[in-house]
Structures are given as C-alpha cells and as structure tokens.
Amino acid sequence: MTTSPSSSDYSSTEDSIYECKSNQSASVGYYPSENTFSYEDLVSREETASVDSLVHFLPPVQSTWRTESLRRLFRKRDQVEHDPEQFSKLSITLAWDIDVDSNHADSLANLDLNAHSQWMDKWPEDKTKLTPCKLYNLVQKLETFLGKEKGGQHDGCVLPESTQKEDVHLNSTTPPHTAQVSPKERDVCQDLSKQRSLENEDICQVLEDPPRLLKDEVVQEIRQASESSLETSSVSSPQPEGASRSHNIFCMNFRWVFQWLRTQIFSRWRRQRPSQATNTWHQKAVRNIHSLRSNRIQPQE
C-alpha cells in the first residue's frame, strides 16, 4: 500500500517525458545533443513525487507545513551547491523551523519563507537579520533562567526580614487585654523586640557572607587563648602551693603526736608489768630453740 502512489507518479512522469520526445521527433528533427530533458529534471520530479506521497501519511495540520519546507529545501539545493555561506545559513533556518514545529502560533514559525528567500536573494547584505532575532530570544530565556536561580538564593535572606516585620507589627499593635501595662513591662518588650531584630540581622549577614577566617586570624586567636590560659594558671598557682604546705605541716604534726603517744604507752606498760614481760620473752626464746632442734634432720641408724 505504501509504494502504490510513488510508482504511479513515477510511471506518469515517464509517460509525459516519452510523449514530449515523440512530439519533438515528429515535428522537428530529433538530435540527441538538443535534448532539453536532463537527468536532473528526472531526479527533481521524482523528489516532488516522493514529497507528494508523504502528504498522505502526515496529519492534516502538519502536511502542508512539512511539504512546503521540503519543497523549499529541494529548490534551494541546486542554488546552494556553489555557495557554502548560503548553505550554512539555510541549514540554520531549517533547523530553527524544525525546532519550532510544535509552536505554530509563534510569529517566526508562520513567516512566508518563500517570499523571504527571494528577498534574501535580491539583497544578500541583509541575509543575517533572522539570526540575531532568534539569538535574542535564546538570550532572554537564559536571562529568565538565571534570574529564577538568583531569586531562589535570596529567599533564605528574605525570610528573616519578613519575620522581623512581623515582630515589629506585633509589638506595635497592642491587644485590648494588655492595654493597662506598666512602663517597665513595655520597656522589657521593646528590648526583646530589639534583640530579635539583631538576631535576624546576624542571620542575614551569615547567609550572605559566610565566615571565612584567615590564617592570621586563627593564629591570633590561638595566641590569645594560650595567654589567657597562662594568666589563669599563674593566678591559681599560689593557692595549691599554700594548701600543699599546710597539708605537709599537718601530716608532720600528726606523726610526731602518734610517736609520742606510742612511747608513753609502752613505757607505762613496762613499768606496771616488768616481771611478766621478762618471763614472756625468755619463754618465747626457749620455745624457738626447741622447735629448731626438733626440726633438724636426724641421721638414720
């Protein structure tokens, strides 16, 4: 089914060519060198027949527009073969038309390109007037896209400002049940609102300019911290030395008192029981001697 229209058109073109040749040979002498029909004419007619056959397979809206663009392409091909600049510009316009195929309402898509091509052939200096318009549209799209990105980045800083305005509005409007408020309480409320506004400003500054400490600043902070630690140690050092000295003196006194008590107790105990002490000492010595003798190894008989 798909090849029937093209084959019929091709056969009709061949019949028409054959009839023209027969008429020329009958009326005037036919010479091969004077043949007006060339191979290029056959190719161009075959291409037009193929274009007409494509119309049956396209929707009604796209068929007319696509056939015009294809015919225009085939017409321009022979003219553009010897001019590379014109070929590049034609390819740009055709690529743009294919991109704009979905938007038929666009003014650029609905231009009369056949008439415009004739105008371009007459005035070759104005051939490049279409491209700046199209590039301008692309630049506008890029600018809108970048503007949206910038707006998304600034949303973080806009939120604290809105909260600040809400706080000011709440502080300015006093409800009826708090109409009878003392001036001290009002001052406290104002101070709180100021603190909140300062916090919001700090948040905005942090979001806009993140903290970036340089090496010199870091070194200065480390030096300040070390100096402060040395000062605190020098201030707190006299107290432990005094405490350690007092502790040592107390321990020495306690030892001296303990030794004195020990000597006193033993001396009194010896005075009260001198005989018992001597007897117990002798008895222990004798017992030790007997135990040593009994533990000696005796020779076997």
Swiss-Prot record:
Sequence ranges of Polar residues compositional bias: 170-181
InterPro entries: DUF4640
Region called Disordered, residue ranges: 167-186, 225-244
A Pfam family annotated for this UniProt entry: DUF4640
Positions with biased composition (Low complexity): 226-237
Name of the protein: Uncharacterized protein C12orf71 homolog
Organism: Mus musculus
